[in-house]
Amino acid sequence: ATFSEAPPGNIKSGEKIFKTKCAQCHTVEKGAGHKQGPNLNGLFGRQSGTTAGYSYSAANKNKAVTWGEDTLYEYLLNPKKYIPGTKMVFPGLKKPQERADLIAYLKBSTZ
């Protein structure tokens, strides 16, 4: 399934998902530091493995995917399948609604 087939995302629900499943390793605010994972500010339109000051796995750099709704929707289903060798230990979000909500929140909070 692709992002175009996903249900509409809810920013507030996405924020809750981010706080419970992502915020222990990621920040979204401009100028916020990296944690276990990179700061996600400016994520949309950026190539994987290119955030300044973060040490990525070779897998993330070599994937060279441009992050957007479609690529994030697929990645967040199963990160280790999408980028074998990624350092991200998160197992993914199986529910299309949760992925759509998280993407809506990320789009709103990282631009």
Curated annotation (Swiss-Prot):
Gene3D superfamilies: Cytochrome c-like domain. The modification N6,N6,N6-trimethyllysine is found at K80, K94. One of its GO terms (molecular function) is electron transfer activity. InterPro entries: Cyt_c-like_dom, Cyt_c-like_dom_sf, Cyt_c_1A/1B. Binds 1 heme c group covalently per subunit. Keywords: Acetylation, Electron transport, Heme, Iron, Metal-binding, Methylation, Mitochondrion, Respiratory chain, Transport. It comes from the Eukaryota. Pfam families: Cytochrom_C. The modification N-acetylalanine is found at A1. It is found in: Mitochondrion intermembrane space. The keyword Electron transport applies. Heme c binds at C22, C25, H26, M88. One of its GO terms (cellular component) is mitochondrial intermembrane space. PROSITE patterns: CYTC (PS51007). Belongs to the cytochrome c family. Electron carrier protein. The oxidized form of the cytochrome c heme group can accept an electron from the heme group of the cytochrome c1 subunit of cytochrome reductase. Cytochrome c then transfers this electron to the cytochrome oxidase complex, the final protein carrier in the mitochondrial electron-transport chain. PANTHER family: CYTOCHROME C. The authors placed the amides at positions 10, 24, and 97 by homology with other cytochromes c. There is one amide at position 108 or 111. This is Cytochrome c. It comes from Fagopyrum esculentum.
